[in-house]
Design a protein with these regions (language model features):
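Conserved small/polar residues in nucleotide/adenosyl-binding loops
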Residues: 259-266
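Conserved SAM/AdoMet-binding glycine-rich loop
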Residues: 21, 25, 30, 135-255
Length: 267
Protein backbone atom coordinates (compact mmCIF):
# COMPACT_ATOMS: atom_id res chain seq x y z
CA UNK A 1 0.00 0.00 0.00
CA UNK A 2 2.85 2.39 0.78
CA UNK A 3 4.54 1.87 -2.58
CA UNK A 4 1.19 2.13 -4.37
CA UNK A 5 0.55 5.47 -2.69
CA UNK A 6 4.03 6.71 -3.59
CA UNK A 7 3.36 5.77 -7.22
CA UNK A 8 0.06 7.66 -7.17
CA UNK A 9 1.74 10.77 -5.77
CA UNK A 10 4.41 10.62 -8.49
CA UNK A 11 1.71 10.69 -11.15
CA UNK A 12 -0.11 13.58 -9.47
CA UNK A 13 2.99 15.76 -9.55
CA UNK A 14 4.30 14.74 -12.97
CA UNK A 15 3.30 18.06 -14.53
CA UNK A 16 4.29 20.24 -11.57
CA UNK A 17 7.44 21.16 -9.77
CA UNK A 18 8.30 18.23 -7.53
CA UNK A 19 7.54 18.89 -3.83
CA UNK A 20 9.58 17.56 -0.95
CA UNK A 21 8.30 14.00 -0.45
CA UNK A 22 8.35 12.64 3.10
CA UNK A 23 7.34 9.11 4.08
CA UNK A 24 6.78 8.68 7.80
CA UNK A 25 5.59 6.13 10.32
CA UNK A 26 6.37 2.60 11.47
CA UNK A 27 6.43 0.96 8.03
CA UNK A 28 8.58 3.74 6.63
CA UNK A 29 11.10 3.19 9.40
CA UNK A 30 11.19 -0.57 8.85
CA UNK A 31 11.56 -0.21 5.06
CA UNK A 32 13.96 2.74 4.90
CA UNK A 33 16.72 1.07 2.85
CA UNK A 34 14.27 -0.62 0.48
CA UNK A 35 12.40 2.63 -0.09
CA UNK A 36 15.61 4.45 -0.93
CA UNK A 37 16.48 1.75 -3.49
CA UNK A 38 13.04 1.51 -5.10
CA UNK A 39 11.90 5.13 -4.93
CA UNK A 40 14.55 7.82 -5.48
CA UNK A 41 11.53 10.13 -5.63
CA UNK A 42 11.46 10.05 -1.79
CA UNK A 43 13.45 12.79 -0.10
CA UNK A 44 13.05 11.92 3.58
CA UNK A 45 12.04 8.97 5.73
CA UNK A 46 11.01 9.96 9.24
CA UNK A 47 10.35 7.52 12.08
CA UNK A 48 7.49 7.94 14.57
CA UNK A 49 9.80 9.26 17.29
CA UNK A 50 10.83 12.23 15.14
CA UNK A 51 7.52 13.80 14.06
CA UNK A 52 8.20 16.79 16.28
CA UNK A 53 11.35 17.52 14.27
CA UNK A 54 9.69 17.67 10.84
CA UNK A 55 9.97 21.49 10.43
CA UNK A 56 13.69 21.42 11.29
CA UNK A 57 14.28 18.39 9.08
CA UNK A 58 12.64 20.11 6.11
CA UNK A 59 14.88 23.15 6.56
CA UNK A 60 17.91 20.86 6.79
CA UNK A 61 16.91 19.09 3.56
CA UNK A 62 16.39 22.39 1.74
CA UNK A 63 19.97 23.34 2.59
CA UNK A 64 21.66 20.05 1.71
CA UNK A 65 19.34 18.48 -0.92
CA UNK A 66 20.36 14.99 0.18
CA UNK A 67 18.20 11.97 1.06
CA UNK A 68 17.59 12.13 4.78
CA UNK A 69 16.77 9.31 7.17
CA UNK A 70 15.60 10.23 10.69
CA UNK A 71 14.58 6.98 12.38
CA UNK A 72 16.50 6.83 15.65
CA UNK A 73 14.65 6.11 18.91
CA UNK A 74 14.58 9.16 21.16
CA UNK A 75 11.23 8.89 22.87
CA UNK A 76 12.26 10.84 25.99
CA UNK A 77 13.46 13.78 23.91
CA UNK A 78 10.20 13.75 21.97
CA UNK A 79 8.00 13.94 25.05
CA UNK A 80 10.16 16.64 26.61
CA UNK A 81 9.58 18.68 23.46
CA UNK A 82 5.88 17.96 23.00
CA UNK A 83 4.84 18.87 26.55
CA UNK A 84 6.04 22.44 25.85
CA UNK A 85 3.55 22.87 23.00
CA UNK A 86 0.36 24.62 24.19
CA UNK A 87 -2.92 22.76 23.78
CA UNK A 88 -5.51 24.06 21.31
CA UNK A 89 -7.72 26.68 22.94
CA UNK A 90 -10.83 25.34 21.18
CA UNK A 91 -10.57 21.60 21.90
CA UNK A 92 -13.23 19.89 24.01
CA UNK A 93 -11.73 16.44 23.44
CA UNK A 94 -7.98 15.82 23.27
CA UNK A 95 -5.44 13.00 23.07
CA UNK A 96 -2.68 12.45 25.61
CA UNK A 97 0.10 9.96 24.88
CA UNK A 98 1.20 8.16 28.05
CA UNK A 99 3.08 5.17 26.68
CA UNK A 100 5.00 4.11 23.58
CA UNK A 101 6.49 0.91 22.23
CA UNK A 102 5.57 -2.71 22.81
CA UNK A 103 7.24 -5.83 24.25
CA UNK A 104 4.66 -8.36 23.02
CA UNK A 105 6.18 -9.20 19.59
CA UNK A 106 3.00 -10.42 17.90
CA UNK A 107 4.15 -12.06 14.68
CA UNK A 108 2.07 -9.79 12.44
CA UNK A 109 3.20 -6.50 13.99
CA UNK A 110 6.16 -4.23 13.24
CA UNK A 111 5.71 -1.94 16.27
CA UNK A 112 8.37 -3.48 18.59
CA UNK A 113 10.96 -3.04 15.84
CA UNK A 114 10.04 0.54 14.94
CA UNK A 115 8.72 2.04 18.17
CA UNK A 116 11.10 0.16 20.42
CA UNK A 117 10.50 -1.35 23.87
CA UNK A 118 7.69 -0.19 26.14
CA UNK A 119 8.28 3.23 27.62
CA UNK A 120 5.97 4.90 30.16
CA UNK A 121 6.01 8.65 30.65
CA UNK A 122 6.50 9.99 34.19
CA UNK A 123 3.20 10.15 36.07
CA UNK A 124 3.61 13.76 37.21
CA UNK A 125 4.36 14.84 33.63
CA UNK A 126 1.10 13.28 32.43
CA UNK A 127 -0.96 14.80 35.25
CA UNK A 128 0.53 18.25 34.57
CA UNK A 129 -0.28 17.96 30.88
CA UNK A 130 -3.83 16.77 31.62
CA UNK A 131 -4.44 19.65 34.02
CA UNK A 132 -3.12 22.09 31.42
CA UNK A 133 -5.54 20.63 28.87
CA UNK A 134 -8.47 20.96 31.27
CA UNK A 135 -7.52 24.55 32.13
CA UNK A 136 -7.66 25.27 28.39
CA UNK A 137 -11.19 23.88 28.05
CA UNK A 138 -10.68 20.17 27.39
CA UNK A 139 -13.35 18.01 29.05
CA UNK A 140 -12.57 14.59 27.55
CA UNK A 141 -9.09 13.05 27.44
CA UNK A 142 -8.18 9.89 25.53
CA UNK A 143 -5.00 8.24 26.82
CA UNK A 144 -2.89 6.81 24.00
CA UNK A 145 -0.24 4.13 23.67
CA UNK A 146 0.71 1.29 21.34
CA UNK A 147 0.00 -0.92 24.34
CA UNK A 148 -1.61 1.63 26.63
CA UNK A 149 -2.60 -0.70 29.45
CA UNK A 150 1.04 -1.76 29.80
CA UNK A 151 1.68 1.67 31.35
CA UNK A 152 4.09 1.00 34.21
CA UNK A 153 6.03 3.87 35.81
CA UNK A 154 8.24 3.60 38.91
CA UNK A 155 8.78 6.62 41.16
CA UNK A 156 10.41 6.41 44.60
CA UNK A 157 9.93 2.63 44.58
CA UNK A 158 6.18 3.04 43.91
CA UNK A 159 4.78 1.26 40.87
CA UNK A 160 2.13 3.30 39.03
CA UNK A 161 0.01 1.41 36.52
CA UNK A 162 -2.73 2.59 34.16
CA UNK A 163 -5.28 2.07 36.93
CA UNK A 164 -3.28 4.41 39.21
CA UNK A 165 -3.17 7.07 36.51
CA UNK A 166 -6.90 6.82 35.77
CA UNK A 167 -7.74 7.21 39.47
CA UNK A 168 -5.61 10.36 39.67
CA UNK A 169 -7.14 11.80 36.50
CA UNK A 170 -10.59 10.98 37.88
CA UNK A 171 -9.91 13.55 40.64
CA UNK A 172 -9.37 16.46 38.21
CA UNK A 173 -12.50 18.52 38.87
CA UNK A 174 -13.42 19.91 35.45
CA UNK A 175 -12.49 16.77 33.53
CA UNK A 176 -15.68 14.94 32.53
CA UNK A 177 -14.62 11.84 30.57
CA UNK A 178 -11.59 9.54 30.35
CA UNK A 179 -10.91 7.03 27.57
CA UNK A 180 -7.87 4.96 26.58
CA UNK A 181 -6.67 2.95 23.58
CA UNK A 182 -5.25 0.53 22.41
CA UNK A 183 -5.07 -2.35 24.89
CA UNK A 184 -3.65 -5.88 24.97
CA UNK A 185 -5.64 -8.62 26.77
CA UNK A 186 -2.58 -9.76 28.76
CA UNK A 187 -2.36 -6.34 30.44
CA UNK A 188 -6.06 -6.14 31.34
CA UNK A 189 -5.49 -6.53 35.08
CA UNK A 190 -8.10 -6.75 37.84
CA UNK A 191 -7.10 -3.35 39.24
CA UNK A 192 -7.76 -1.80 35.82
CA UNK A 193 -11.08 -3.62 35.51
CA UNK A 194 -12.09 -2.25 38.94
CA UNK A 195 -11.72 1.28 37.57
CA UNK A 196 -14.91 0.71 35.58
CA UNK A 197 -16.69 0.40 38.93
CA UNK A 198 -14.85 3.05 40.94
CA UNK A 199 -14.11 5.86 38.45
CA UNK A 200 -17.28 7.57 37.25
CA UNK A 201 -15.39 9.58 34.61
CA UNK A 202 -14.02 6.48 32.86
CA UNK A 203 -16.25 5.95 29.81
CA UNK A 204 -17.85 2.45 29.90
CA UNK A 205 -16.32 1.42 26.58
CA UNK A 206 -13.28 -0.71 25.78
CA UNK A 207 -11.48 -1.42 22.52
CA UNK A 208 -9.76 -4.75 23.17
CA UNK A 209 -8.32 -6.50 20.08
CA UNK A 210 -8.40 -10.29 20.04
CA UNK A 211 -7.29 -10.71 16.37
CA UNK A 212 -8.73 -14.24 16.04
CA UNK A 213 -11.33 -16.51 17.62
CA UNK A 214 -9.20 -19.59 16.91
CA UNK A 215 -6.72 -20.76 19.55
CA UNK A 216 -4.29 -22.32 17.00
CA UNK A 217 -4.22 -19.03 15.08
CA UNK A 218 -3.73 -17.02 18.27
CA UNK A 219 -0.73 -19.25 19.00
CA UNK A 220 0.65 -18.68 15.49
CA UNK A 221 0.21 -14.94 16.06
CA UNK A 222 2.13 -15.16 19.36
CA UNK A 223 -0.71 -13.36 21.13
CA UNK A 224 0.13 -14.98 24.50
CA UNK A 225 -3.51 -15.70 25.36
CA UNK A 226 -6.34 -17.93 24.17
CA UNK A 227 -10.02 -17.33 23.45
CA UNK A 228 -11.11 -18.49 26.92
CA UNK A 229 -8.81 -15.98 28.62
CA UNK A 230 -10.11 -13.15 26.44
CA UNK A 231 -13.75 -14.02 27.13
CA UNK A 232 -13.05 -14.19 30.88
CA UNK A 233 -11.97 -10.53 30.74
CA UNK A 234 -15.19 -9.60 28.98
CA UNK A 235 -17.25 -11.40 31.64
CA UNK A 236 -15.39 -9.68 34.49
CA UNK A 237 -16.05 -6.29 32.93
CA UNK A 238 -19.74 -7.06 32.43
CA UNK A 239 -20.09 -8.02 36.09
CA UNK A 240 -18.41 -4.77 37.13
CA UNK A 241 -20.45 -2.61 34.71
CA UNK A 242 -23.35 -4.21 32.87
CA UNK A 243 -23.64 -1.25 30.52
CA UNK A 244 -20.10 -1.45 29.15
CA UNK A 245 -19.66 -1.69 25.37
CA UNK A 246 -16.83 -3.32 23.41
CA UNK A 247 -15.08 -3.19 20.07
CA UNK A 248 -12.27 -5.38 18.76
CA UNK A 249 -9.93 -6.14 15.84
CA UNK A 250 -9.84 -9.36 13.81
CA UNK A 251 -7.39 -10.56 11.17
CA UNK A 252 -9.18 -12.91 8.76
CA UNK A 253 -7.13 -15.21 6.54
CA UNK A 254 -3.96 -15.10 8.61
CA UNK A 255 -1.01 -16.94 6.92
CA UNK A 256 -1.14 -20.72 7.52
CA UNK A 257 -4.80 -20.37 8.47
CA UNK A 258 -6.94 -23.14 6.97
CA UNK A 259 -10.20 -22.28 5.22
CA UNK A 260 -12.17 -24.53 7.57
CA UNK A 261 -10.98 -22.44 10.53
CA UNK A 262 -12.24 -19.13 9.15
CA UNK A 263 -15.68 -19.73 10.68
CA UNK A 264 -14.11 -20.15 14.12
CA UNK A 265 -12.04 -17.02 13.59
CA UNK A 266 -15.24 -15.07 12.92
CA UNK A 267 -17.22 -16.59 15.80
Amino acid sequence: KVYHEIGRVKKDFRNFNKPIVIVSGCVAQAETEEMQKREPYIDMVIGPQSYHRIPDLILNYQRKKLFFNETEFDVVNKFDYLQKIPNSQNAISSYLTIQEGCDKFCHFCVVPYTRGPEYSRPLNQIIDEAENMVNNGVREITLLGQNVNAYNFFDNKINYKLSSLIRKLNNIKKLKRIRYTTSHPKDMTDDLIDCYKDCEKLVPFLHLPIQSGSDPILKLMNRKHDKKYYLSIIEKLKKINNGIKFSSDFIIGYPRSEERRVGKECR
